[in-house]
Amino acid sequence: MTKRTLYELQAENVRKTYLFIVLFSLILFAVGYFFVWYFNWGITGIIFLAIFIVLYNWIAYEQSDKIALTSVGAVPADPEKFYVLHNIVEEVALAAGVPKPKVYVMNEPQPNAFATGKDPKHASICVTTGLLQMMNREELQGVIAHEMSHIRNRDILLMTVVAIVAGLIILLRDVFLRSMWWGIGGERRRDKNDNLGIILLLIGLILSIIAPIVVLIIRSAISRQREYLADATGAYIVRDPYGLASALEKIGNYTRPMRTASSATAHMFISNPFGKVEYLFATHPPIEERIKRLKSLTI
């Protein structure tokens, strides 16, 4: 396997992010054009569709981190109440050579964490209250180092944009299914041709089947190797693979799913937020294998 430098990995993540944006814009235009045609909105509809796509891409690039944090109910971690967490984040950021990210906490008993943002200067790390309660200092440091690796490697923009894209794909599926179920545009359908109702029905059914598959394909770009790389890089940052290994062992033993778990954002977390439940869109490598690899590292 050809070894790549950190800068090459960062450049690859940026390229993939832009590729996702372009491909998704084409998909969105195709779906939107069907609505424009079906409701006979003409050139006005096409103009509004183009504006929507541009606006959505801007939101995905500039505001996706805020959307991700809001979607899980994350709040800024008070520096006095969570002074140990802030101290660890600052230490690890210094060791990783990146600016200290903003620190967030989500009220969730499952031990977990994720990083988000468009670049290291605009990054955030979020941990659950369950993680803070369950981990000792070395274990928490290992988890933070893992997330800091995603920030340093510029994984965060790609992961966050994919989450927003996946969320909209699921939303589009639901819109079609509701349109099919409630017969939105019924008068227009009867005025045009009854066959259009059949077309809408087929599109809704097809989307309901392929939307999760599209999500899976998109998220497959968030390779499992990225998690292995972040594990190893994090261990080297803090010069200790055993803290993260111990943390992953505790995380793996917690079997209850996250209350706010979503298939759109699952890949962002350090561990599968659905717990031990096997589901179609799993993006994380087995925790047992991650622990094994960490313990085999020589630092």
From Swiss-Prot:
According to its UniProt record, which cofactors does this protein need?
Zn(2+)
Pfam families in the record, alphabetically? Peptidase_M48
Q: Name one GO biological process term.
A: proteolysis
Which cellular component, as a GO term, is one annotated location? Answer: plasma membrane
Co-factor remark? Binds 1 zinc ion per subunit.
Supply the EC number(s). Answer: 3.4.24.-
Q: Read off the CDD domains from this record.
A: M48B_Htpx_like
Q: Which UniProt keywords apply?
A: Cell membrane, Hydrolase, Membrane, Metal-binding, Metalloprotease, Protease, Transmembrane, Transmembrane helix, Zinc
Q: How does it sit in the membrane?
A: Multi-pass membrane protein
InterPro entries hit by this protein? HtpX_protease (IPR050083), Pept_M48_protease_HtpX (IPR022919), Peptidase_M48 (IPR001915)
| Molecular functions (GO terms) | metalloendopeptidase activity; zinc ion binding
Active site positions, chain numbering: E147
Q: Where in the cell is it found?
A: Cell membrane
First-level EC class: hydrolase
NCBIfam families the UniProt entry points to: PRK04897.1 (NF003425)
| PANTHER family documented for this protein | PROTEASE HTPX (PTHR43221:SF1)
User: Sorted alphabetically, which HAMAP family does this protein's record hold?
Assistant: Pept_M48_protease_HtpX
Q: Give the UniProt family note.
A: Belongs to the peptidase M48B family.
Please identify the protein, giving its name as recorded: Protease HtpX homolog
> What is the species of this protein?
Caldanaerobacter subterraneus subsp. tengcongensis (strain DSM 15242 / JCM 11007 / NBRC 100824 / MB4) (Thermoanaerobacter tengcongensis)
Identify the gene encoding this protein: htpX
